[in-house]
Amino acid sequence: MLGDNLQPAALVQVFEDVICDDYYKTNSLPPASDGALANPCKAQPIQKELALVRGFQQLVPIFPSLLCTVPYGLLAERIGRKRVLIMSGAGVFSALSWVLAVCYWRFASIRWALLSGAFLFLGGGDAVISTILHVMVTDTADDAERAQIFLYLHAADVISGFFGPAISGPLMEKGHTWIVLLLAAATLFSGAFLLTIFIPETLNLRKRSTDDSALLSDSTSPETTDSPRSELPTPTKLSNSIVGEASNLLSPLLSVLASNRQALLLLLIFSPQTGARELFTLIGLQYTNAKFSLSYARGNVLLSLFQGAQGLFVLAILPLITRLVADRRGWSAWARDRLYAIVSIAATALGLMVIGIAPALIVEAFGLLFVAVGSCSTGLLMSLLGGAVRPSQVSAVYSAAHMLSIVVRSVIGPVLSALLVTGLELGWNWMGLPFVTMALLMVGAAVASSFIRSERVANFDED
């Protein structure tokens, strides 16, 4: 988590430097008297290329996510969650290493950095990591604890998001942008190969209820769960088994989505949440730099504010509201999470709209605070989704949720980056176009969330 949150501002700065150098190798520098271009790297062609590269970089994970999430999820059922988690971390580390190699040695165009997605086929990338972590929580926690643990995971993410920019900002101010990126790479390496040693394997801890045993018959057989040191299948048998189990898993999943309208509704609402929350990280620094002339290094302050507000809300304010209001009124976990999710999505929509139309930097900061309030919607919706299906279907719908989220985020990235380019071309008043567009999408999600059932039902296949 910390490795990811150290990168955003430093990567934008390095990308801009590389694009700027490449551009002026074939184009003359602007006249020194041109006050509008005191920094030659702020020329529109350079900023346009930067926005497009950053946007298409979000498209990179879509193919590994689509092709690998289910197979690696099934592989985790056979060889263990922990081993797949290590593989996924190794793939993410390798992808970042490729980007840094392209930018440092410059042996190819900056667009070659987009090939980092090929390394994500090792382990499946962030989608598999997120899915495995959620399944590990489901292995060990009951319904009452699940939502709280998901919020704690989100809190860990936002806390690292606070310290990441707080660390990178001062280093970038002193010109140590590459030190920040090397620190990020070292952190990812530690997370992939060192910290995972201390994470227990949860495959054998799964409660062996009738519903759980129906998830994947092979994954709960004595050969794979009761005897952790049993002989592993050969690669050929494992490959054939994964293909067969993928087919067996997708068929019930499609059946669930066709018959369980609540699960389908929750999946559709969940899909744009991560993209909305990460929009400022994706294009916010470039947007703020263009609109309010705030440097990327100092833009880390906004990222720290954003992440710190998320942590404060998730760790302190939301639990306090739960104790003072929800618990005293006797709300069920489902009713509580439903209301929180609706309010969170509405707050995100409001915050994005404020950022998009902000006339001053302080107003943009207030918009970020509203988005921070809405940032817990992902954990809340995942909890609702887990409660809307049978226990035997949780792993499948979680995989579907993360795949859908990655796909939507990957598609939204280039689209909103293109809107940022359009806004830059149209002028100051239109620069917030991508934020306003995303705000309208979240308004639709907020309206849709009002159709979530007010109470959990026993018959999961009811419409």
Model segments located where?
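Glycine-rich segments within core transmembrane alpha-helices of 12-TM secondary carriers
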Residues: 145-173, 187-188, 310-313, 402-415
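A late C-terminal transmembrane helix in Major Facilitator Superfamily
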Residues: 391-425
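Juxtamembrane intracellular "pre-TM" segments in multi-pass secondary transporters
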Residues: 202, 206-275, 290-291
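Intracellular juxtamembrane helix-capping segments at the cytosolic ends
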Residues: 10-11, 124-142, 284, 376-390
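Multi-pass alpha-helical transporter architecture, strongest
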Residues: 189-203, 355, 411, 421, ...
